[in-house]
Amino acid sequence: MSGKMTGIVKWFNADKGFGFITPDDGSKDVFVHFSAIQNDGYKSLDEGQKVSFTIESGAKGPAAGNVTSL
């Protein structure tokens, strides 16, 4: 849907496995599911963490995909 974007993790609930990323370009916050995180091992994000991601078409609207830590 679009190229790589960068943003900051607004919040992430590790127990439920999802959260939101605030894009650096000022666009609307993007839903992120743990399955989109490209880390080895435990897939979680920290509040305030800088990440890069793509926008995918999720079941309930736009969602982050290919999420990697910067």
UniProtKB/Swiss-Prot annotation:
The entry's keywords: Activator, Cytoplasm, DNA-binding, Stress response, Transcription, Transcription regulation
Domain of life of the native organism: Bacteria
Function: Binds to and stimulates the transcription of the CCAAT-containing, cold-shock-inducible promoters of the H-NS and GyrA proteins. Also binds to the inverted repeat 5'-ATTGG-3'.
Matches recorded under InterPro entries: Cold_shock_CspA, Cold_shock_domain, CSD, CSD_CS, CSP_DNA-bd, NA-bd_OB-fold
Protein name: Cold shock protein CspA
Any Gene Ontology CC annotation: cytosol
GO molecular function terms attached to this record: DNA binding; nucleic acid binding; RNA binding; single-stranded DNA binding; single-stranded RNA binding; transcription antitermination factor activity, RNA binding
Induction / repression: In response to low temperature (at protein level).
Compartment(s): Cytoplasm
Gene Ontology terms describing biological process: negative regulation of termination of DNA-templated transcription; positive regulation of DNA-templated transcription; regulation of gene expression; response to cold
SUPFAM superfamilies to which the protein is assigned, alphabetical: Nucleic acid-binding proteins (SSF50249)
